[in-house]
Amino acid sequence: MDRQKLEAQLAELPLYEYAFITTAELLFSQRVRYICETECPMYNTTWACPPAVGTVDACRNRVMAFDEGLLIATITEVSDIANIRETLATRADHEAITRQVLEMVRQQATDTLTLSTEACAHCEHCTWPDAPCRFPDRMFPCVESHGILVTDLAEKHGIEFLAQGNLVTWFSLILYK
């Protein structure tokens, strides 16, 4: 990976921060998955969420097939962070940036795995569990669905997690070979 070339491209995007990471730095926790199961209304409703993504162990194995990655963060302002509808509506801009970064990475990589903020909203009604995903190339599972403590990774790289007042931080993790 030519990091200088990629960094020059990243400088053109409205990223809050980014960091090159190794998968050895990732911390996986069943507790993160438990939050999906008990608090997220998307649990068991899409291909991008548990249980469709597999067990935490299966997710860990899929992730650890890669050695390196790129953690990207964007921030957005909302009028009221407690308004979950407004907050979630801001994910679309982050996902668009994630797709741009993925295309940059793919120019230099032989394989990628992208995890992001999505519980997937590409289809009005997800085919889970009755039929295969209609758009697997567009769907990025949520980082947390894989049991990854993204805030721990961000902290290791000095990326501040803003979820206070009216600022929201969104993260994506693009793994590559």
Which sequence ranges carry the predicted segments?
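Catalytic cores of enzyme domains
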Residues: R3, Y16-T46, P50-K177
